[in-house]
């Protein structure tokens, strides 16, 4: 199994915790799925912790400390603040997979908006009251398909 690692030169805006966590992840040869199972989170949410895009709870810090053999004091210092979300990716993205996700929004963003507005009315889908997951499907011909589910609470615009 290949594991996701961090090349800090490609991610100059990540917090110090990213280097700490990714180094321990590599040393322990753990996947995000394995780490997620240990800390009781979704694997995308777990990866978001590593990239500094999600807030770690005290329980997350304790469990990560135990699993990754990192001092709880170091993790507490590096993970206890509020995330500075959205700074980790330059726009438009250059990394091909991230660019494809961006391209999906470019190509289908207004189509998603139109369909969502027809179904729910004037509003937005929350990225705060939100969950996501990634699944792998294999079709009858043996082709692998990525299935990304986005689930966000619908927030209607207020009239004032």
Curated annotation (Swiss-Prot):
What EC number(s) does this enzyme carry? 4.2.1.104
Catalysis: reaction(s): cyanate + hydrogencarbonate + 3 H(+) = NH4(+) + 2 CO2
Q: Name one GO molecular function term.
A: cyanate hydratase activity
Which UniProt key words apply to this protein? Lyase
Tell me which family the UniProt entry assigns to this protein: Belongs to the cyanase family.
| HAMAP family recorded | Cyanate_hydrat (MF_00535)
> Would you tell me the protein name for this molecule?
Cyanate hydratase
Native species: Neosartorya fischeri (strain ATCC 1020 / DSM 3700 / CBS 544.65 / FGSC A1164 / JCM 1740 / NRRL 181 / WB 181) (Aspergillus fischerianus)
